[in-house]
């Protein structure tokens, strides 16, 4: 993290450090104050607290093309070859001049870095974007960094809480990801601190899958309408500030936390509930009675293996053609989990949102709503505002709201109609 202060050139790929990782954002701002050249390939024109030398924003397909154009420019500078697939994407970019400027900056400035951010991880073709970003880093001699997805994402990868790897990077049979698990309905689900539809990429599919399941077990800290109608058993657990625990930060450093509040009612620390359930089922690995023993058992798993993802399989490119606006999902900073969603003080700030749709001003004008108005998508009414952060041809849809859950995921197209009042 400290190395960012000394960076001379930085490419942000799907990253808004000011919101995604404020401490990292502060380091980048310091580097900018000392003359660092900062560039971005992003889905939206984010409100950064530093200036950008070059900014390429576009719909999900354009993001791939623009990043590929940077890769193509670097390949030409370094006289190296790269895949025909990336070359084909590069030819689709309409921002060739800026892409070449970014390539020259990364090539000439030392040290340089490529930061693969949270919005890139959420892209429908994240693995393709990652492959291109890694090529850019390798061709330019830049460091490559990827932001962990979620507050404890790095620890989850280390201990194997992902479908494609075991503890410490050990090989394992590839299981279903969360999207497949809800789109291809299962007979039973176990939810741990997750709320549907708000916490899922395809919230509508998640809520429907839970409603159709034969059995749903939920570990939850809050009452929720979906759980009340779909869960067969709800086990109350404490929130993170109410229990002892630990996190692994972006530098891989283990950070322990102590409980700072008392759990209400019958709630118990989640690890205690899991231990009791594991013991009742006769499973191995649950022979611990306190957090210190649990922590000692898990800690060795955090230091082994590698998080290298260069061998990953490319994902398809599910970006819809046809008419209508392309959806760009966006998770507002105060909609990321059940705690902040239930905090009135946070929701009343300037960063609090109400689930309105956002369009580029020219698209809003063409629709006839001016700066703000009501629109309909599939017969459902939404507030809509014009915003210069949104690229042309894109509809920014806020995630984390039950009201927007029925709208499609990033890369799909929607038809929007103006609602005439009165």
Residue spans of the language-model regions?
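Long, well-ordered, tryptophan-enriched scaffold segments
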Residues: 4, 32-117
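Short alpha-helices
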Residues: 43, 50-83, 126-129, 135, ...
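Acidic/glycine-enriched edge-of-secondary-structure segments
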Residues: 72-96, 151-173, 262
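A glycine-rich, hydrophobic/aromatic-adjacent loop/helix-cap motif
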Residues: 107-181, 328
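Conserved active-site and cofactor/substrate-binding residues in soluble primary-metabolism enzymes
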Residues: 23, 61-65, 94-97, 101, ...
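A cross-kingdom feature strongest in bacterial/archaeal respiratory oxidoreductases
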Residues: 6-12, 18-47, 115, 130, ...
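Iron-sulfur-cluster electron-transfer modules
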Residues: 1-25, 29, 55-59, 65, ...
């Amino acid at each position: 993290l400290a190395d960012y202060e000394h960076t001379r050139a930085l490419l942000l790929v799907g990253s808004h450090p000011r919101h995604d990782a404020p401490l990292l954002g502060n380091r980048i701002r310091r580097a900018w104050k000392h003359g660092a050249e900062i560039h971005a390939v992003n889905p939206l024109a984010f409100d950064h607290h530093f200036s950008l030398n070059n900014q390429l924003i576009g719909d999900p397909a354009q993001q791939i093309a623009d990043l590929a154009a940077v890769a193509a420019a670097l390949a030409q500078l370094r006289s190296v070859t790269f895949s025909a697939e990336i070359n084909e994407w590069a030819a689709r970019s309409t921002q060739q001049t800026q892409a070449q400027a970014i390539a020259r900056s990364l090539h000439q400035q030392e040290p340089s870095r490529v930061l693969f951010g949270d919005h890139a991880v959420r892209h429908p073709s994240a693995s393709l974007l990652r492959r291109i970003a890694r090529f850019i880093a390798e061709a330019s001699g830049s460091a490559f960094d990827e932001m962990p997805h979620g507050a404890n994402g790095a620890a989850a990868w280390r201990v194997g809480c992902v479908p494609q790897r075991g503890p410490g990077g050990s090989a394992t049979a590839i299981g279903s990801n969360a999207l497949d698990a809800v789109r291809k309905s299962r007979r039973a689900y176990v939810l741990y601190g997750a709320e549907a539809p708000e916490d899922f990429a395809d919230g509508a599919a998640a809520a429907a899958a839970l409603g159709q399941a034969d059995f749903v077990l939920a570990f939850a800290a809050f009452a929720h309408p979906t759980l009340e109608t779909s869960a067969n058993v709800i086990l109350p657990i404490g929130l993170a500030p109410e229990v002892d625990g630990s996190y692994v930060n972006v530098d891989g450093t283990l950070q322990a936390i102590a409980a700072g509040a008392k759990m209400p009612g019958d709630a118990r620390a989640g690890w205690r509930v899991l231990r009791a359930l594991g013991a009742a089922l006769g499973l191995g690995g649950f022979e611990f009675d306190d957090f210190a023993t649990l922590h000692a058992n898990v800690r060795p798993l955090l230091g082994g293996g590698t998080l290298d993802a260069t061998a990953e399989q490319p994902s398809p490119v599910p970006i819809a053609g046809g008419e209508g606006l392309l959806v760009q999902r966006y998770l507002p900073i105060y909609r990321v989990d059940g705690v902040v969603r239930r905090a009135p003080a946070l929701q009343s700030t300037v960063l609090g949102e109400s689930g309105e749709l956002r369009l580029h001003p020219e698209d809003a004008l063409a629709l006839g709503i001016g700066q703000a108005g009501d629109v309909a998508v599939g017969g459902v009414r939404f507030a809509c505002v014009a915003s210069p952060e949104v690229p042309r041809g894109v509809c920014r849809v806020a995630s984390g709201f039950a009201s927007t859950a029925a709208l499609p995921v990033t890369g799909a197209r929607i038809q929007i109609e103006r609602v005439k009042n009165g």
